[in-house]
Amino acid sequence: MENNSFIFTDGKDPKMIEAYKKAQETFKYFWRELSWEYRRIVPGLNIACVKASFSEIDSDGDKIVEHMWMNDISFDGDTVSGYLINEPNDLTTIQPGDYFEIPLNEISDWLFAITPMQKKAKGFSKLFSSSAEPIPKAYGGFTIQKMRADMSESERRDHDEAWQLDFGDYNEIEVVNEQSEKPENLIEHPMSRNMKEDFVKFLEEYPNELTNIDEEGFTLLHRETIAGNLSSVEVLLEAGADKHLKTNKGKSAFDYAKQLNWEHLIPAFEKN
């Protein structure tokens, strides 16, 4: 990511406010992807970050606001946490590397990018295939896409070249990998489907994982629910995970399923 890329955004622009809301509503897909990224031996994401606003009052009593990116993101169902990436332009009380916790309803954007899998050329088509690495495809980036929509075609090309990302069509913002080719990925992450049998075996070998509770009151069922992983949630419930257990904030896994609007999880809780 280019340092300080599009830090400032117009908080009074209705379309920018709409972009903020879209980012907040769809953040769950970002977190779902990141929940699997943290389990991968070989990283699959080129970039994964969240944008939020940061402010302070200057010596004249005026409020200074900058929108900047954080990475190393964590999420507990309510709060997004991470470390500041950008160097502020005007803010003086924060710096890159500072840790922040931001309520989900206060983030302004999220972005992740994945390098598309290259299909191997066969036969005659090999003569016309390129050996160049494909450009990582961006997902999310609602405020970025709003700004791209306001640019001329040449400005968009320069912008995308600076980021070295394929942002696609600003009118069709995708939130999950291969969304156009595999719309079923909106319902469940492919790794969740593919790992179901392995997860069953894992719980058979480590049954204590069903009942382990961390210092904040979260169980594995809470975590998998927040990430929207249907197969994992089904396996946990069928194995006897207690869906009534509440975190220190007083929320059950089912509460998080409803709060984050993971519609595909709700029948699993009602059934078990």
Locate predicted features.
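Short coil-to-beta transition motif at edge beta-strands of beta-rich domains
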Residues: 37-62
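Short solvent-exposed strand/turn elements
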Residues: 80-102
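Short coil-to-beta-strand transition motifs
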Residues: 60-71, 75
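Intrinsically disordered, low-complexity regulatory segments in ankyrin-centric signaling systems
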Residues: 167-206
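Ankyrin-repeat boundary/"N-cap" motif
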Residues: 180-189, 211-220, 246-252
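Ankyrin repeat domain, specifically the short helix-to-loop turn at the C-terminus of the second helix
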Residues: 201-209, 234-242, 270-272
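Ankyrin repeat A-helix N-terminal signature
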Residues: 189-195, 223-229, 256-262
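Leucine-rich solenoid repeat scaffolds
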Residues: 243-272
